[in-house]
Amino acid sequence: MHHLHPMIVCIFVMYTGIVGSDAIAGDQLLNIGVIQSKIRSLMYYTDGGASFIVVKLLPNLPPSNGTCNITSLDAYNVTLFKLLTPLIENLSKISTVTDTKTRQKRFAGVVVGLAALGVATAAQITAAVAIVKANANAAAINNLASSIQSTNKAVSDVIDASRTIATAVQAIQDRINGAIVNGITSASCRAHDALIGSILNLYLTELTTIFHNQITNPALTPLSIQALRILLGSTLPIVIESKLNTNFNTAELLSSGLLTGQIISISPMYMQMLIQINVPTFIMQPGAKVIDLIAISANHKLQEVVVQVPNRILEYANELQNYPANDCVVTPNSVFCRYNEGSPIPESQYQCLRGNLNSCTFTPIIGNFLKRFAFANGVLYANCKSLLCRCADPPHVVSQDDTQGISIIDIKRCSEMMLDTFSFRITSTFNATYVTDFSMINANIVHLSPLDLSNQINSINKSLKSAEDWIADSNFFANQARTAKTLYSLSAIALILSVITLVVVGLLIAYIIKLVSQIHQFRSLAATTMFHRENPAFFSKNNHGNIYGIS
């Protein structure tokens, strides 16, 4: 591989903020459309100890000759007290602890204090417990507040009786020192009063913005680092650097959002606010790089393909792992994680990332595929076989050879590039060697599952139409079955009624026949009896005196 001048390498490292990668073959991967968009360091963090910051909300003015009456300061004091009164009352309600010496009743007092929270999450209850604990150390806090009340220094470290270091921050005093103190003896009191009033009004606006959510319940809503930045003003970097005792970039830590603050108590007498800042413990993994990869489509025999690589990998000790960083905090130059999320990658992908391009796996792309270009480090990477690449300055059309996977366009080739309807201003020079001995014609194209959006949509539409037809047929047959079932039920009922009718009629006929037979027998007997009575000699003659013929 072509070696770069040491000065160029130094400038490149300073520009990106990271060291060049060895395990991953970045130059070779450019041939197949894999671009390293960002390289970050890997940081681990865990919950650390808490630091306390005392914010002095009222500035100290230098002594005057007695002729100046700064009315704006009194108005600011009244307005600030009105603003903080809901916070003070809420904190007092939550931190109320029963005055007793027994352990059981002390615990019950904390429970009573927490009962003011209502329905709260575990994190909110933890925050409230922190306020209760801070209230138990109220004497030390008051001593700390008193010790910084008379100072004009914007940042001063004070050690209380328990040797707990806290930082006294006077954000507004920092502004007063810069704008007021140096000229208060040489200008009129009215002008300074107006200037002080404008500064105080601006700070009140910022305070209202910061504590907008905390007015309802400050213990349950932590202050973000953005709110702390507004609250502490220009003193925040000094506070953070004094607390962390680390070489990490302060802006990087602030952008992570891992530093949070919580209001612990407010002193109405001194207008001072005690804020607990939760500072995690950070550890950097030496030699580890988290690399973001962008895979754009490449050209293979006039067919559009895309290589199968992870979106983010971890390079450590000359090894490569998949590193999604789903549970991590990603900043411009670092990845903050609680644990290592690395996982093994297939051997073919490993060899591909190491520069063995014949081991790379490609998937054909059919239809529209939006990832045809990428803009990284001031250089444009594009598949100009599937995309119209036009240079506006100097005007020409960028052509791409059939054996090349992508085109790399830097400021030497074009300063303003047009990709279809997109316009890009190219600002950097491509300072790596573009390997041209690999031909996409010999690439290992594996037809995994082609990403054919148009065909897939058509297939889905056909499936939906077929499903609708089947549903219509199903409804028709269901209606038919429902009608047939009704007819069958009616026929069965009619048949049963007919059978019952026939049985009843048969029984009636049998009964009538039996009744008629009995009537005939009765009539025959009655006629015989009547004849005997009328002709007794006949029966006596024929039956020898037995009128019934009985011997």
UniProtKB/Swiss-Prot annotation:
Residues 107-131 are annotated as: Fusion peptide. The keyword S-adenosyl-L-methionine does not apply. Residues 514-551 are cytoplasmic. It is a single-pass type I membrane protein; Single-pass membrane protein. The keyword Cell cycle does not apply. Keywords: Cleavage on pair of basic residues, Coiled coil, Disulfide bond, Fusion of virus membrane with host cell membrane, Fusion of virus membrane with host membrane, Glycoprotein, Host cell membrane, Host membrane, Membrane, Signal, Transmembrane, Transmembrane helix, Viral envelope protein, Viral penetration into host cytoplasm, Virion, Virus entry into host cell. The chain crosses the membrane at residues 493-513. InterPro entries: Fusion_F0_Paramyxovir (IPR000776). Glycans are attached at residues 65, 69, 77, 90, 431, 461. Disulfide bonds join 68-189, 328-337, 352-360, 384-389, 391-414. Residues 132-160, 456-481 form a coiled coil. Pfam families: Fusion_gly. It is found in: Virion membrane; Host cell membrane. The record marks 106-107 as: Cleavage. The inactive precursor F0 is glycosylated and proteolytically cleaved into F1 and F2 to be functionally active. The cleavage is mediated by cellular proteases during the transport and maturation of the polypeptide. Its main location: virion. GO terms for cellular component: host cell plasma membrane; membrane; viral envelope; virion membrane. One of its GO terms (biological process) is fusion of virus membrane with host plasma membrane. Residues 1-23 form the signal peptide. Residues 24-492 are extracellular. Belongs to the paramyxoviruses fusion glycoprotein family. Homotrimer of disulfide-linked F1-F2. Class I viral fusion protein. Under the current model, the protein has at least 3 conformational states: pre-fusion native state, pre-hairpin intermediate state, and post-fusion hairpin state. During viral and plasma cell membrane fusion, the heptad repeat (HR) regions assume a trimer-of-hairpins structure, positioning the fusion peptide in close proximity to the C-terminal region of the ectodomain. The formation of this structure appears to drive apposition and subsequent fusion of viral and plasma cell membranes. This is Fusion glycoprotein F0. It comes from Human parainfluenza 2 virus (strain Toshiba) (HPIV-2). The lineage of its organism: Viruses, Riboviria, Orthornavirae, Negarnaviricota, Haploviricotina.
